[in-house]
Curated annotation (Swiss-Prot):
Protein name, UniProt field: Protein AUXIN RESPONSE 4
Tissue and organ distribution: Most abundant in root tissue, lesser amounts in rosette leaves, stems and flowers and very little in mature siliques.
Main location: endoplasmic reticulum
Keyword RNA-binding annotated: no
Pfam families, alphabetized: Abhydrolase_1 (PF00561)
């Protein structure tokens, strides 16, 4: 019997055999490894960073140049609009000393009219200047009144800061670099190293002492009632204005009240124009970082602020002039510092009833168009000063530019109803050099008369005058 056996078939390969790489493929891969393709570099990042660096450097240099030009009086003056430059050319500056331990500063004064007539002295509030009263003093001058408008220190064209030498005041990075450079110029590059070798310690205290002794920094002028009294007194004495009719606008009442109390004999009358302890312009916003830069950098924002709180009748050019004066030469810092020194507890009723002041003729000129609250404030002032004449004008809280003629009419009429002022004129003392010439001439003249010679005398005593004289204007 035959046995049939089945042979197992070889398993079929399911996956097809891989193709063998061709020689050409090996050649390609070898050539790729040997000669890799250079990757193209993107130039965008380089030019991007280059542009950023150049832009930042440009901004820094422009900022530094603008900062230096703002602190340079000549550059600042040349950048002013024609109206401000014309106003400055019509006035003059006077040296005054606010504090005995400080250097004298310059105060700007604008005036109009004959000096031989009644004198009206106008004092502005914080945030304003004599520029706001330029039309008003011209109108008063045309009515036969000598009118004088003063820029209080820290405002307008008067000095707004003073140089402080020495001290340990905080300074910026650029100023500190200049100090180090100046110290190296004076002591040499290796001075500190030599001191360290000799003493075994870095002369840190001596370096700080040297830096502080030579440090020059600008300090904003802070003006309170005491400082204002000194300034008013020196300006009035220097120009020989006393007695004066005093016109106080806005916050000038609190600033000038001390001088009036101490010198009531030199005051013929007082006129208050929308006077309050706090200024109409909200100066506190100029102390808020970010907001202050925007308000003073652009006319639009400052115009809206003035229109909302102070005056809706002022022209854009006049508002912009006030913005420029506040912005330049540390004006903002000075006004904000003076704002902090205002006497907010000032009692106008007590002041008006004090000895000396209660006998001064007074007039209150108040806005009837500002707001109901402001009209109520005017009535309160009128009750506090019952002897004062009370009239209203058709302007806002800053009426001196849009209603200058109306205000001038009120002031001139009020002044004309009062008795004529008696002005005391103190003649200049004879200079020492001239006094010597007088003595020599007198000795020679006595000698000549002794010998019978007659000579004409040079009239020094008539030119300078001896003693004091009373004149009536």
């Amino acid at each position: 019997m035959a046995i049939i056996t089945e042979e197992e078939e070889d398993p079929k390969t399911l996956n097809p055999p891989k193709n063998k790489p061709k020689d050409s493929d090996f050649t390609k891969s070898e050539s790729t490894m040997k000669n890799p393709k250079p990757q193209s570099q993107n130039p965008f990042p380089f030019w991007f960073y280059f542009t950023v660096v150049v832009s930042l450097a440009t901004i820094i240099f422009i900022s530094l140049s603008l900062f230096s030009s703002q602190n340079d009086p000549r550059s600042w003056f040349l950048s002013l609009p024609p109206a401000l430059r014309q106003h400055y050319s019509n006035g003059r500056t006077i040296k005054v000393q606010v504090n005995s331990n400080e250097s004298p500063i310059e105060v700007f004064v604008a005036e109009s009219g004959s000096i031989h007539t009644e004198t009206v002295v106008i004092v502005h509030g914080l945030g304003l200047s004599s520029f706001a009263f330029k039309e008003m003093i011209q109108s008063l001058g045309s009515k036969g009144i000598h009118s004088v408008a003063i820029d209080l220190p820290g405002n307008g064209f008067s000095d707004k800061s003073m140089v402080v030498i020495g001290g340990d005041r905080e300074i910026g990075f650029v100023a500190r670099v200049k100090e180090v450079y100046g110290l190296i110029q004076e002591k040499g590059v290796f001075w500190a190293f030599d001191q360290m070798i000799e003493t075994g310690d870095l002369p840190y205290e001596e370096i700080i002492k040297l830096q502080n002794s030579k440090r020059r920094s600008f300090k904003a002028i802070e003006l309170g009632s005491e400082e204002t009294a000194r300034v008013l007194g020196q300006v009035i004495d220097t120009l020989g204005l006393a007695p004066v009719h005093l016109v106080l606008h806005d916050s000038a009442l609190g600033l000038a009240s001390n001088w009036v109390s101490e010198n009531w004999q030199s005051v013929r009358s007082v006129t208050l124009i929308d006077s309050s302890i706090s200024p109409a312009l909200p100066l506190w916003v100029l102390n808020v970082p970010g907001i202050r830069e925007i308000l003073l950098a652009f006319s639009f924002g400052f115009e809206k602020l003035v229109s909302f709180r102070c005056s809706k009748e002022m022209t854009l050019s006049d508002i912009d002039a006030h913005r420029i004066l506040l912005k330049g030469r540390n004006g903002r810092e000075a006004v904000v510092a003076s704002l902090n020194k205002l006497n907010h507890s000032f009692d106008i009723a007590q002041w008006g009833n004090s000895d000396g002041i209660n006998g001064i003729p007074m007039q209150v000129i108040w806005s009837s168009e500002a707001s109901k609250e402001w009209s109520d404030e005017g009535q309160r002032v009128a009750k506090a000063l019952p002897k004062a004449k009370f009239v209203t004008h058709s302007g806002s809280r800053w009426p001196q530019e849009s209603k200058s003629g109306e205000l001038a009419d009120y002031i001139s009429e009020f002044v004309s109803l009062l008795p004529k002022s008696i002005r005391r004129v103190a003649e200049e003392p004879i200079p020492e050099e001239v006094q010597k010439v007088l003595e020599e001439a007198k000795a020679g003249d006595d000698h000549d008369h002794h010998h019978g010679h007659g000579h004409a005398h040079a009239g020094y005593s008539d030119a300078y005058g001896l003693g004091e004289e009373w004149t009536t204007t």
